[in-house]
Amino acid sequence: MNTRHLLFAFAALLPLAPHGAAQESPTLRKIAETGVISIGFRDKSIPFSYLDKQQRPTGYSIELCYRIVDAIRTRLKAPGLEVMLRPVTSANRSAFMLNGIVDLECGSTTNTLERQKEVAFSVTTFVAATSLVAKKAARIDSLQALKGSTVVSTAGTTAINALGDTAQAQGLDLHIIPGRDHAEAFSMVEADRALAFVMDDVLLHGLVAAAKDPGMYAIVATDLPVQPYGIVVRKNDPEFKKLVDEAIVALFKSGEVQQIYRKWFAPLQLPMSPALKKAIAAPTDSGDPAAYR
């Protein structure tokens, strides 16, 4: 099956009449009228949003989004609300949201002040550090050790933008290759086409864990900014964003998010960071990395 055109639909329901707060929210009104909520997912963003062995979208962000869907079903009194899952990429995820193709984007999208000009973000659900992965044999111990080398980062991400800015500011003279997705970027390091792959640490851990020989690779911290992740929603729909935030914050307050976190990150041996603990204790949708120090 071609995952680029993968489309999953669960349950079936005739279109619903708008109900209550749905009339105050364009997104809720659309969902109520069509009887469908459309979720954008990534196919290779382990452990946030990816396809499992049965080619079904799964992951930390997907699980959070299904909890949001439960809250929407409750708000609309529509227990049979249909969920449609659509694959998105770094290149088209914003356009899909702006054009109404997806109602929630559930992947590993970093909340930035620049992106907030086009879309809105839920309260932060994860805080990643920007790191690099290289083969241990290369003995790379810092971003500066890559000076004059060919490196790769995923196109359309905040990591590749930060890498370019830092390389220029520090005179690192890097040849930066944009990978189409995380898997392609990592494969360039595997094939020695790039000395290192610069990306969010948690995504690198997922890729290394799935590699043929994980022991060949080292993940190294950098001085690039942290990356706060959130669920993407449409801008200028505060009623819908409020519902999304309330569903996530409920998981924070109940402590259930701890169990969900362990489910997806314990296999990668990634304990919850102080920055994420802070964001859970005091929920925020800030796109400023300084807010997570």
PLM regions with names:
Residues 8-15:
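Bacterial N-terminal signal peptides
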Residues 62-71, 137, 144-145, 149-150, ...:
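Extended ligand-binding regions for polar small-molecule ligands
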